């Protein structure tokens, strides 16, 4: 299968290219860019492959003629400007940015601080590709954000089964520096990140509305969440620590929670549920896995859920390949056999 990647110079785009290069069903990868210096884009791959990497200027018609699917690994706002032609022609696209995630254009403008170029009708029909829960049925797939993925994976069993107070959810999430993208900023400067920990975008992170959008699909009476994001002094990895008040009045709360997680994820190849333990980043970094653990406090009736992912894998490129596999009917694990780095 011939695939196109639009926007390959960022961290997520680079990892996506690496994954697709090893995918058993991918025969050709064509790279497209809106940047003027095509040679500079191609040079970043010289050390990764002996084959010549050809980078071409973005041309929607040429992409559709030469490929069977297009991945957009572009910054927010770019897909919205470029994707309408693909959508009009029902050409499959998988978007790693946030441009197709929110069904309400006004919500996009509020949280991303720019107007969307995508129509409300298109947004309402886009598939939100949280692969463990969403059957991919449309030709345009919105790959979930990294914070959203970890948070929703941790909350899903408890929200769907109404085991928690839906107005009590607090999320304290922390990500490695690659989650902030490749563009240099004061917050991601080495001197400011190394041996430091900082919070950013408190109650303002753009993944909040997509989290709420999905939670309300599972539970329409879901209340707002308190959401905090922090920057870890590591390259990759994301941990969401989630707190919620348990509504079940039973001595068997731990068994009830365990049964909910087991029933939800028992046949999901990329989810590891830990019994009586808490996950750390080493369990997932370098892989497409989500590792989840929890602890219930019978004194406060609060359950603490810890959900960890690699922000560039399950939080971006890995889940994009999962969506690709699901859409085309490939084995869900195809191209995603990477083990955690651990060391």
What is the predicted role of each segment?
Residues 1-193, 200, 296, 342-343:
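N-terminal Rossmann-like NAD(P) cofactor-binding subdomain of oxidoreductases
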Residues 2-5, 142, 241-243, 305-308:
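Short glycine-rich or small-residue beta-strand-to-loop segments that form or flank ligand, phosphate
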Residues 22, 217, 326-330:
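Short, well-ordered loop/turn and helix-capping segments at boundaries between secondary-structure elements
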Residues 157-161, 245, 323-330:
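Active-site catalytic microenvironments for nucleophilic, acid-base chemistry
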Residues 282-343:
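C-terminal helical cap and adjacent loop that interface with cofactors, partners, or active-site loops
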Residues 11, 125, 146-153, 202-210, ...:
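Conserved active-site and cofactor/substrate-binding residues in soluble primary-metabolism enzymes
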Residues 27-66, 167-168, 177-305:
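C-terminal substrate-binding/catalytic lobe of Rossmann-fold NAD(P)-dependent oxidoreductases
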């Amino acid at each position: 299968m011939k695939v196109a990647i639009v926007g390959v110079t960022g961290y997520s785009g680079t990892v996506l290219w690496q994954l697709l290069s090893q995918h058993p069903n991918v025969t050709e990868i064509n790279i497209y860019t809106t940047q003027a210096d095509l040679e500079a884009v191609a040079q970043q791959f010289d050390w990764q492959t002996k084959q010549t990497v050809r980078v071409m200027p973005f041309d929607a018609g040429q992409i559709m003629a030469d490929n069977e699917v297009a991945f957009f690994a572009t910054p927010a706002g770019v897909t919205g400007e470029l994707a309408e032609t693909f959508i009009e022609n029902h050409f499959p696209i998988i978007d790693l940015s946030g441009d197709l995630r929110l069904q309400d254009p006004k919500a996009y403008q509020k949280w991303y601080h720019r107007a969307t170029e995508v129509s409300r009708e298109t947004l309402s029909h886009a598939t939100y590709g949280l692969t463990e829960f969403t059957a991919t049925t449309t030709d345009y797939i919105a790959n979930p954000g990294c914070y959203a993925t970890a948070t929703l994976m941790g909350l899903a069993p408890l929200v769907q089964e109404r085991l928690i107070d839906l107005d009590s959810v607090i999320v304290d999430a922390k990500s490695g520096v690659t989650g902030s993208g490749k563009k240099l900023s004061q917050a991601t400067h080495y001197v400011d990140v190394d041996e430091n920990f900082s919070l950013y975008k408190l109650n303002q992170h753009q993944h909040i509305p997509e989290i709420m959008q999905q939670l309300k699909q599972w539970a329409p009476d879901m209340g707002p969440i308190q959401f905090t994001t922090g920057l870890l002094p590591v390259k990759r990895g994301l941990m969401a620590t989630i707190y919620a008040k348990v509504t079940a009045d039973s001595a068997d709360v731990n068994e009830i929670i365990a049964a909910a997680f087991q029933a939800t994820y028992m046949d999901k190849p990329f989810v590891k549920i830990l019994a009586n333990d808490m996950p750390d980043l080493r369990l997932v970094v370098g892989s497409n896995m989500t590792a989840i653990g929890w602890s219930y406090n019978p004194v406060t009736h609060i359950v603490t859920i810890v959900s960890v992912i690699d922000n560039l894998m399950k939080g971006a490129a890995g889940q994009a390949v999962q969506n690709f596999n699901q859409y085309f009917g490939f084995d869900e694990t195809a191209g995603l056999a990477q083990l955690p780095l651990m060391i």
